[in-house]
């Protein structure tokens, strides 16, 4: 989005125009998935939406969890954070497994792409899980939408727009609320609304400090 200072593509570029067209098609496929609620409808929607909307961004060479950074997959790993490999190495040491009571046969993985692929081929990733939140909010369960401006994968603008359109008991209050800077021992850059969302300024995935 051009309203995000970290946008990857120029608004008038061919890439953006293609993304707009793909977004419209993705929305239609998602509607069919939501209506039919079947693998036959949801898997094609999932594959098309992820491929057409995330594909161009993946080709830029930036870290999609923090677009201010470049990503060298050979050096930084599949998900652009070498720390994840370090954690895997530590947790797969026999001594650590023994202390934690983990069987030798189990290998720890920071992110299991095989499981990810299985979710994708069930069409789960494209289904509207927001339906599950509405009754929780009505029952008084608190929800915090927490996003970093520089995170492409969990896009702050998209999350905010979703929160403002999401039908729930706080819908009117959230839309009428104003964004106010949040201070916690100094300015944080976050601008929460009283009823709902927090966008963490200048941060990446999970608003990871120093990302």
What do these predicted regions represent?
Residues 1-211:
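Terminal and linker regions of secretory-pathway proteins
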